[in-house]
C-alpha cells in the first residue's frame, strides 16, 4: 500500500494536466512510477483504502492466460471488464475487423498465446516461458508481450500493461511487468493484483519459489472526474495491513490454468478495507 499511496499523492502534488484524445477528458499525469510486490511473503497488494474486487482482476488475467478474444468468455470467468471496450468503443464498433457482439479482436492474451509470424504460423510465448522455467532455464528473454503494433487495428484496445519478463536466480523466480498507461484510481487496482498473481501462479506451475514482482508504469494518471474522490476521500483514509492470497495447490501445470481452474481456486484472507468508492470509468 505504501508505494500505491505515494504514487497517488505524487500525481496530486506533481501531476501535469494532459488532454486525452481517446476519452475527450483531461488527465493529471506523471511519468515513471515503480511499485514492488512481495510475493515471497504473500503480501497481497489489495487496496485497503477502498473496497477492492480482487476476483474480477484475477479472472481477467486468467482469460489472458487462456488467450480469450471475446467478452462473453471473460464474463463466464467472472469479470465484465471487457464489455465496454468490446461493445461501446465507437472506433471499434466502426472497425471492419470487428466480428460482432463481444468480439475484442487480437488483443492481450491472443498475442501472448498466438502471436502471428509472417508465414501464418503462430508463436505461443507463454508456453515457451513455462517450458524453459520448468527446466531451470532463463535465457534472459523469458518475455511475453501483448504489444504488437502490426495488429493494433485488429483489436478494440492497445494493451496498457503490455510486457511481462521473468527472471530466474537459482530456484527463485522474479517478474518485471511493464505498463505504458495506467488509470491509477481504477486500473492500478486491477493491475497490481494481476502482476502479483501472475508471478505466484508461474512459480507454482514451474516448481520455483516466488520472489518479488516489479511493476513499472510509464504514464500514470488520474482523470479529471476522478480527482476529487482521490484527494478528498481515498487519500484521507488510513490503510489497513495487507491480506494474503491462497491459490489451490492442485494447480500444477499450464494445462490446469487453461482448462479447469475457476475463481473458486483462489481465496483471500485477512482483508480489511474502507467503503467502496465509485470512480468514473473512461471508455
UniProtKB/Swiss-Prot annotation:
Entry keywords, A to Z: Cytoplasm, Methyltransferase, Nucleotide biosynthesis, Transferase
Keyword check for Methyltransferase: yes
Pathway in which this enzyme or protein is active: Pyrimidine metabolism; dTTP biosynthesis
GO biological process: dTMP biosynthetic process; dTTP biosynthetic process; methylation
Catalytic activity annotation: dUMP + (6R)-5,10-methylene-5,6,7,8-tetrahydrofolate = 7,8-dihydrofolate + dTMP
Superkingdom in the source lineage: Bacteria
Binding site for (6R)-5,10-methylene-5,6,7,8-tetrahydrofolate: 183, 282
Residues annotated as signal peptide: none
UniProt-listed Enzyme Commission number(s): 2.1.1.45
PANTHER family membership: THYMIDYLATE SYNTHASE (PTHR11548:SF9), THYMIDYLATE SYNTHASE 1 (PTHR11548)
Protein name (record): Thymidylate synthase
Amino acid at each position: 500500500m505504501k508505494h500505491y499511496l505515494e504514487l497517488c499523492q505524487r500525481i496530486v502534488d506533481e501531476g501535469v494536466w494532459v488532454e486525452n484524445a481517446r476519452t475527450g477528458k483531461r488527465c493529471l499525469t506523471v511519468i515513471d512510477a515503480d511499485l514492488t510486490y512481495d510475493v515471497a511473503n504473500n503480501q497481497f497488494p489489495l487496496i485497503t483504502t477502498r473496497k477492492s474486487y480482487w476476483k474480477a482482476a484475477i479472472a481477467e488475467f486468467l482469460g489472458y492466460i487462456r488467450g480469450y478474444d471475446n467478452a462473453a468468455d471473460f464474463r463466464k470467468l467472472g469479470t465484465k471488464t471487457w464489455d465496454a471496450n468490446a461493445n461501446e468503443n465507437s472506433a471499434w464498433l466502426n472497425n471492419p475487423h470487428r466480428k460482432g457482439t463481444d468480439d475484442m479482436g487480437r488483443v492481450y492474451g491472443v498475442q501472448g498465446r498466438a502471436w502471428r509470424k509472417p508465414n501464418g504460423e503462430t508463436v505461443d510465448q507463454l508456453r515457451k516461458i513455462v517450458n524453459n522455467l520448468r527446466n531451470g532455464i532463463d535465457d534472459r528473454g523469458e518475455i511475453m508481450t501483448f504489444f504488437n503494433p502490426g495488429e493494433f487495428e485488429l483489436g478494440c484496445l492497445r494493451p496498457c500493461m503490455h510486457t511481462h519478463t521473468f527472471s530466474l536466480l537459482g530456484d527463485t523466480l522474479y517478474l518485471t511487468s511493464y505498463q505504458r498507461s495506467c488509470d491509477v484510481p481504477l486500473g492500478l487496482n486491477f493491475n497490481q493484483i494481476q502482476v502479483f498473481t501472475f508471478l505466484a501462479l508461474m512459480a507454482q506451475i514451474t516448481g520455483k519459489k516466488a520472489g518479488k514482482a516489479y511493476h513499472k508504469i510509464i504514464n500514470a494518471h488520474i482523470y479529471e472526474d476522478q480527482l476529487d474522490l482521490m484527494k478528498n476521500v481515498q487519500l484521507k483514509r488510513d490503510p489497513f495491513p495487507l491480506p494474503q492470497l491462497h491459490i489451490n495447490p492442485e494447480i500444477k501445470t499450464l494445462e490446469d490454468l487453461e482448462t479447469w481452474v475457476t475463481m473458486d481456486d483462489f481465496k483471500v484472507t485477512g482483508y480489511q478495507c474502507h467503503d467502496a468508492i465509485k470512480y468514473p470509468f473512461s471508455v
